[in-house]
From Swiss-Prot:
Transmembrane segments: none
Compartment(s) where it occurs, according to its Swiss-Prot or TrEMBL record: Cytoplasm
Active site: residue positions: 157 (proton donor/acceptor), 161 (proton donor)
Reaction equation(s) it catalyzes: (S)-2,3,4,5-tetrahydrodipicolinate + NAD(+) + H2O = (2S,4S)-4-hydroxy-2,3,4,5-tetrahydrodipicolinate + NADH + H(+); (S)-2,3,4,5-tetrahydrodipicolinate + NADP(+) + H2O = (2S,4S)-4-hydroxy-2,3,4,5-tetrahydrodipicolinate + NADPH + H(+)
Annotated Gene Ontology cellular component terms: cytosol
The EC number(s) this enzyme carries: 1.17.1.8
Annotated protein name in UniProt: 4-hydroxy-tetrahydrodipicolinate reductase
Pathway, per record: Amino-acid biosynthesis; L-lysine biosynthesis via DAP pathway; (S)-tetrahydrodipicolinate from L-aspartate: step 4/4
Function in brief: Catalyzes the conversion of 4-hydroxy-tetrahydrodipicolinate (HTPA) to tetrahydrodipicolinate.
Entries under Gene3D superfamilies matching the protein: Dihydrodipicolinate Reductase, domain 2 (3.30.360.10), NAD(P)-binding Rossmann-like Domain (3.40.50.720)
Organism of this sequence: Rhodopseudomonas palustris (strain HaA2)
Signal peptide: none
Any one GO BP annotation for this protein: diaminopimelate biosynthetic process
């Protein structure tokens, strides 16, 4: 079987460079395209050199339609506007679209859902094995404990992160809500400030911290009468997300059209 040909979207960014490095380390995949935003000063530069590798001859381009003509998939950790633009082209080309972009709105998610009748999409707020195991455990614990245990999710990221709560925190919140059998949107408490009143029973709280160079720390706290359960994950290098994205792309290659998650990729969907 020939290598899976992949495009890295946002190839000039931190995650894009990590993806380029991960591809160079992984058997069965090859970098065939590097996408960057129109007008970027990085256009035309070599993706390998930008990632701290020897030159690989793949220059950054803003033309996804041309890049995708000879590709099998795209790895997309960009921003919502770029991801939604990429969704349409990936669907037209019939290539695998792995989406790790965070900060997507409900309307963005509706657009992604609409293309999955003919497109293969793997979407997750976090691509690492550890976080998805944490989500599975969160769901199980939430199922087992009653409303007398309050659920709080605390996350910390580097000072440059532009969205909050993080996609991973929301992933964990969805897992907790699923375990409780409730809708997260109607049970979510975010950004408490001032005279907020007592905590509502059944709420799932979020706290977001920003500072330094933290790759990503997440804790799920179940606070009950006179005892607490804490589940936590600390990411030490964004390469864990890059290798997870590659695992997702290879898993999805040849699958039927649909919207999949890392839980599907890792066999945790029924956990």
């Amino acid at each position: 079987m020939s290598d899976m040909r992949l495009i890295v979207a946002g190839a000039g960014g931190r995650m894009g460079r990590a993806l380029t490095r991960a591809i160079s380390e992984t058997k069965g995949v090859v970098l065939t395209g590097a996408l960057e935003a129109p007008g970027s000063e990085l256009l035309g530069q070599d993706a390998g050199v930008l990632a701290g590798l020897p030159a690989n001859g793949v220059e950054l381009s803003a033309d996804l339609w041309t890049l995708s003509a000879n590709a099998d998939g795209i790895l997309d950790f960009t921003v919502p506007g770029a991801t939604i633009a990429n969704v349409a082209i990936a669907a037209q080309r019939g290539i695998v679209h792995v989406i790790g972009t965070t900060g997507l709105s409900s309307s963005d998610n509706a657009v992604i859902q609409s293309v999955t009748r003919q497109a293969i999409v793997v979407k997750s707020g976090n691509m690492s094995l550890g976080v998805n195991l944490l989500a599975a455990l969160t769901k199980r614990v939430a199922q087992s404990l009653g409303d007398n245990f309050d659920i709080e999710i605390v996350e910390m990221h580097h000072r440059a992160k532009i969205d909050a709560p993080s996609g991973t925190a929301l992933l964990l919140g969805e897992a907790a809500a699923l375990g409780r059998g409730v809708d997260l949107d109607s049970h979510s408490a975010r950004g408490r400030d001032g005279l907020t009143g007592a905590r509502k029973t059944g709420d799932i709280g979020f706290a977001s911290l920003r500072g330094g160079t933290v790759t990503g720390d997440h804790s799920v706290i179940f606070a009950g009468p006179y005892e607490r359960i804490e589940l936590a994950h600390k990411a030490e290098d964004r390469m864990i997300f890059a290798h997870g994205a590659l695992k997702a792309a290879q898993w999805a290659h040849g699958k039927k059209p649909g919207l999949y998650s890392m839980m599907d990729v890792l066999g945790l969907a029924e956990f």
